[in-house]
């Protein structure tokens, strides 16, 4: 299975002056923790890291002794554009692909393997967890306009897995129709293509804010102690 890791984000919401994936948890960069899980996922045979050119040296230093083939891919201005560039850089033999946020450093290796197994069966899949809070929709004036049925709400995560051919078609359509999406499953939704949910752990958070970082630090520290 081929894996693309989105690593082109900034540290703006983290309040950092560098790519948040280079911030450290327990003495190791966030991206290193993500890659440790990738290394233990038996299904993953090739990794493409999509990042900004200014971060290439630092990120390639992290993967210099990695046990699996890693390719650097220059990212775009948005996540959507970065994934497009990642798809274009896949080896010719790639038939299926998993997309993962580099900032989801608490991902379990088994989740990659479970997603890969589903994708190889021809199922588009995303990791997700049921929403536990009551969610409100709000109008432009800040007033509540509705309460969606919580039993139908799931928080999307990564990995997300697809047929390479289908995902490329989805991105090509997005360019033609000027669609802007925040994850790849949204392209499938817009095209009325089915995507299945694979329930994952609520701990598979995307480290985006200082609060997220503190949670990740606590969980990794507890894992080390155990």
UniProtKB/Swiss-Prot annotation:
Keywords: Isoprene biosynthesis, Nucleotidyltransferase, Transferase
GO biological process assignments: isopentenyl diphosphate biosynthetic process, methylerythritol 4-phosphate pathway
Gene3D superfamilies registered for this protein in UniProt: Spore Coat Polysaccharide Biosynthesis Protein SpsA, Chain A
Domain of life of the source: Bacteria
EC number assigned by the record: 2.7.7.60
Site (Transition state stabilizer): 13, 20
Descriptive protein name: 2-C-methyl-D-erythritol 4-phosphate cytidylyltransferase
Provenance organism: Prochlorococcus marinus (strain MIT 9211)
């Amino acid at each position: 299975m081929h894996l693309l890791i989105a690593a082109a984000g900034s540290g703006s919401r983290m309040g950092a002056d560098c790519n948040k994936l280079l911030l450290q948890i327990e003495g190791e960069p966030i991206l290193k923790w993500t890659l440790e899980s990738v290394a233990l996922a038996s299904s993953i045979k090739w990794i493409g890291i999509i990042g900004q050119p200014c971060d290439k040296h630092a990120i390639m230093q992290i993967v210099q002794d990695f046990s699996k083939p890693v390719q650097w891919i220059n990212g775009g201005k948005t996540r959507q554009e970065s994934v497009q560039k990642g798809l274009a850089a896949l080896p010719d033999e790639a038939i299926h692909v998993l997309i993962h946020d580099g900032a989801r450093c608490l991902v379990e290796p088994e989740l990659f393997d479970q997603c890969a197994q589903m994708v190889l069966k021809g199922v588009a899949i995303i990791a997700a967890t049921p929403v536990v809070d009551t969610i409100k929709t709000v109008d432009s004036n800040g007033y509540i306009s509705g309460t969606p049925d919580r039993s139908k709400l799931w928080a999307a995560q990564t990995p997300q897995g697809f047929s390479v051919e289908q995902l490329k078609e989805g991105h090509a359509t997005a360019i033609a129709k000027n669609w802007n999406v925040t994850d790849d499953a949204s392209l499938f939704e817009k095209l009325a293509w089915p995507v299945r949910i694979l329930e994952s752990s609520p701990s598979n958070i995307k480290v985006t804010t200082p609060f997220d970082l503190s949670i990740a630090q606590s969980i990794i520290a507890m894992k080390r102690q155990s």
